[in-house]
Amino acid sequence: MKRSKSYRKAAEQIDRTRLYTPAEAVRLAKETSTVKFDATVEVAMRLGVDPRKADQMVRGTVNLPHGTGKTARVLVFAAGERAEQARAAGADYVGDDDLVERIQQGFLDFDAVVATPDMMGKIGRLGRILGPRGLMPNPKTGTVTMDVAKAVSDIKGGKIEFRVDRHGNLHLIIGKVSFDEQKLLENYLAAVDEVLRLKPSAAKGRYIKKITLTTTMGPGIPVDPNATREAAKAA
């Protein structure tokens, strides 16, 4: 793949023979972003787990202290009083059978899905659509709940969901290039700290094998997992 001149120039600023501390990586991410819009900053991790085994699955949520820089569009499956609570909390779409039908017809203009427990029977038929996109509500991530107002508020406030893929990779958005370095660093450490907390007891050897920080269409910055672990503990 042919890279642009600006990309190649940005990539030259990154020393591939070393691993950067989290603070250095965040600074470089801001300096090497070459696009003309407010790029997204993402952290990618390679974990020492076998996700094919149920006891090594890594999945969870984290409330980023400074949000992601993007207001998530939240869809809520609820009826009656819970539906009103969801609307009052700022949900973008609220309904039940009508939303099931819209999604079956191809509607996917949302970033997160919340549901009351009684709605899960109806939502089950959407598994093939929502599941592969990481949008299926789940009690473990707080998206199947009677307290829909809190779930909506948390998501709007910067709560993100993550899940390791079948290759052991994990991707988390931690903000925008326009964030100052300290805010990006605090978001980064909050995300990593939660991933560390969720280390499966069945996982053997090194848990976090590799960390890369990237911006939209920008070069990857290798981050030191050991320095990250120490910084997360101290945060």
Curated annotation (Swiss-Prot):
GO biological process terms, semicolon-separated: regulation of translation; translation
Listed GO CC annotations: large ribosomal subunit
Keyword Transport set for record: no
One function term, GO molecular function aspect: rRNA binding
Keywords assigned: Repressor, Ribonucleoprotein, Ribosomal protein, RNA-binding, rRNA-binding, Translation regulation, tRNA-binding
Record's signal peptide: none
InterPro entries: Ribosom_uL1_bac-type, Ribosomal_uL1, Ribosomal_uL1-like, Ribosomal_uL1/biogenesis, Ribosomal_uL1_3-a/b-sand, Ribosomal_uL1_CS
CDD domains linked: Ribosomal_L1
One Pfam family named in its UniProt record: Ribosomal_L1
SUPFAM superfamilies recorded: Ribosomal protein L1
Superkingdom of the organism of origin: Bacteria
Transmembrane listed as a keyword: no
Coiled-coil stretches noted in the UniProt entry, renumbered to this chain: none
Family: Belongs to the universal ribosomal protein uL1 family.
Assembly behavior: Part of the 50S ribosomal subunit.
Biological function: Binds directly to 23S rRNA. The L1 stalk is quite mobile in the ribosome, and is involved in E site tRNA release. Protein L1 is also a translational repressor protein, it controls the translation of the L11 operon by binding to its mRNA.
Annotated PANTHER family: 54S RIBOSOMAL PROTEIN L1, MITOCHONDRIAL, LARGE RIBOSOMAL SUBUNIT PROTEIN UL1M
Protein name (record): Large ribosomal subunit protein uL1
Gene: rplA
